[in-house]
Amino acid sequence: MDEWYGQVAPREKLLKYGAAVLTDAELLAIFLRTGIPGMHVMKMAEYLIETFGSLHGLISADYQTLCAHKGIGASKYSQIQAIGELACRCFSSHLMRESVLLNPGITQKFLQNILSHREREIFLVVFLDNQHRVIRHEEMFTGTISSVEVHPREIVREALKVNAAALILAHNHPSGKAEPSQADRLITTQVIKACSLLDIRVLDHLVVGRGECVSFAERGWL
């Protein structure tokens, strides 16, 4: 991957100017390292991102879907999955060190990274200590493509187990639209009531769509 199209190769460009100036395709090409006969690694990276619509779409693709494309086997699938997992862990480690109230943007990005590509509704809870630092996060309930059944008592039980003082609720809408439903508002109220009996605060409920996130707290619904 020394030169491509007569321009500076992605690796050399990164070393000279920093990773931030590289395109998604250039960053992907560095991970993939090699192309296939008749297709340079940059061409492969561009093709994959164009085919799946975005880097996020590519990383979210399952094994069978991705490996249906020429030149993609277990090795390159593993490399692509590693990109997504590294990004997730990077956000997670940053979130674990931060106060959620001081940096809500990181919290939203972290939850979007986990939930926005999921094909079923997932209800996730972030458990916080009394200084609103993250203790852990847990995907507590898994539903269908259009709904998820949530049990407030199980959330309270888990909060007591980890000695949480506060919670952030989050779930995704696989449809891609993040606008909360009446059912979303109802279950939020039920969780708040269950938690309030034990002085556990619900700081927010985030609904994650495709490329967007709606905060109950920002809308004044809590």
UniProtKB/Swiss-Prot annotation:
InterPro entries: MPN, RadC_JAB, RuvA_2-like, UPF0758, UPF0758_CS, UPF0758_N, UPF0758_YicR. Residues 100-222 form the MPN domain. One of its GO terms (biological process) is proteolysis. Keywords: Hydrolase, Metal-binding, Metalloprotease, Protease, Zinc. GO terms for molecular function: metal ion binding; metallopeptidase activity. Zn(2+) binds at H171, H173, D184. A motif (JAMM motif) lies at residues 171-184. Gene3D superfamilies: Cytidine Deaminase, domain 2. NCBIfam families: PRK00024.1 (NF000642), radc (TIGR00608). Belongs to the UPF0758 family. YicR subfamily. This is UPF0758 protein YPO0049/y0092/YP_0050. It comes from Yersinia pestis.
